[in-house]
Amino acid sequence: MKLSKLVSLDLSDNHISALPDDWNTLPTLAELRLAKNQLSDLPATMFTRKMQTSLAHIDLSDNQLQTLNAAIYNLSNLAVLKLDRNRLVSVPSGIGKLTRLVQFTASGNLLRTLPSDFDRLTLNSLDLSDNPLADDAPTAIVPCDDGMDVPSLYELAARCVKNKQ
């Protein structure tokens, strides 16, 4: 089967425990969903040169990943990276190279620290909930100073009630 023009691939919930080494046949792949499988690692050759500019969305949630292959940081157009509910104990240094990353989720892992270059990211959405982060781990996360005030949950609830009246 020739898949050279494939843009989106969803192999979620298939009990996949290993991936093939050769992903060179998917040069136009922009979205890869491998959630709810049994992956414990990713092939070192998975993020090939042909995919480095096309892949924008990766969902590896609900697997058994213990480490993240640093080759993922060569994906220059990666915008969404979902790693929720794995067994990750760290995020490798180099994540700051993902200059187009806007959504990063890694809830429900075993993360204790964040890499020093984490503060280079310009995220719109970040979820690190349910991790045993050390007290000093989130120091790389600096609040956005763009003049935007985020309302409290109480204020949002009050607005919702007011709008329903």
Model-assigned labels for residue ranges:
Residues A137-Q165:
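Cullin-RING E3 adaptor/co-adaptor recruitment helices
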Residues G94-L133:
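Repeat-solenoid scaffold signature
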Residues L3, L26, K50-T53, L75, ...:
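Structural signal for repeat-unit boundaries in curved repeat scaffolds
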Residues M1, L19-D22, L42-F47, L65-A71, ...:
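The feature encodes a structural signal of leucine-rich repeats
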